[in-house]
Every structure is written in C-alpha cells, then in structure tokens.
C-alpha cells in the first residue's frame, strides 16, 4: 500500500509541475506549437537519466525512492500520451511540416537529454 501511495504522491507533484510548465510555455510562446509538452518531455528525459544514474547506480536507493521519483514524479511530469495527441492534432490541422518537426524534435532531443543526464552524472562520479 505504501508503494502505491508513493507513486501517487510523486505523480501528483509531477502532474502539477507539468501543468505549470505548460502554462508558462503557453504564455511565453503562444498556442501555435506544443512547446510545453516538448519542454517537459525533454527535461523529463534528462532528469530520468540523472535519477537513473543516482538512484540505481550510485546510491543503490530503495525501491520506494525509485517508485516516488521515477515511476511517480516523472510519470506524472512527462507526457508521451499528450505528445502523441499534439502530433496528431498538428497533422489533422494540415500542419504536416510542423508535425514532423515536432515528432523529430521530441524524439531526438529526448534521447539526447537522457544521454546528457547520464553523462553529466557519470562525469561527476
């Protein structure tokens, strides 16, 4: 039961933070492109690289901490399902180039962010 609570707690915090990042991006960049979703996915991928290195390898942290931070917090913060909907919406609006750029940027930058997060933490070892 405590494990489910930790996932829920982390998810709640991550979801609220995702909401605020989305609102910030909307105010800053406008509604024409899903900047908020792109930002949380890239940042979330970097953070999961950092957490994976710290929690799993460096500190051999408890399963509870992994559930709170990775499954809960990052599960609530990152938004792959929202990414998919945003991409389809761009295509449905006839913005195929923007849709393609969005998909390529999301996948490419997210993969680069995970690699960067791992590399940063490994360099600090």
From Swiss-Prot:
GO terms for biological process: cellular detoxification of fluoride. It is found in: Cell inner membrane. The chain crosses the membrane at residues 1-21, 32-52, 68-88, 101-121. It catalyses: fluoride(in) = fluoride(out). The keyword Oxidoreductase does not apply. It is a multi-pass membrane protein. Keywords: Cell inner membrane, Cell membrane, Ion channel, Ion transport, Membrane, Metal-binding, Sodium, Transmembrane, Transmembrane helix, Transport. One of its GO terms (cellular component) is plasma membrane. Na(+) is not transported, but it plays an essential structural role and its presence is essential for fluoride channel function. GO terms for molecular function: fluoride channel activity; metal ion binding. Na(+) binds at residues 75, 78. The keyword Nucleotidyltransferase does not apply. Fluoride-specific ion channel. Important for reducing fluoride concentration in the cell, thus reducing its toxicity. Belongs to the fluoride channel Fluc/FEX (TC 1.A.43) family. This is Fluoride-specific ion channel FluC. It comes from Rhizobium etli (strain CIAT 652).
């Amino acid at each position: 039961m405590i494990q489910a609570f930790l996932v829920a707690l982390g998810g709640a915090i991550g979801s609220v933070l995702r909401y605020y990042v989305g609102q910030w991006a909307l105010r800053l960049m406008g509604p024409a492109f899903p900047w908020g979703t792109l930002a949380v996915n890239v940042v979330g991928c970097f953070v999961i690289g950092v957490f994976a290195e710290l929690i799993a390898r460096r500190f051999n942290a408890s399963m509870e901490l992994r559930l709170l931070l990775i499954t809960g917090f990052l599960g609530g913060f990152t938004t792959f399902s929202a990414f998919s909907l945003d991409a389809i919406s761009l295509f449905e609006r006839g913005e195929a180039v923007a849709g393609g750029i969005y998909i390529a940027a999301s996948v490419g930058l997210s993969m680069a962010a995970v690699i960067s997060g791992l590399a940063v933490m490994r360099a600090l070892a």
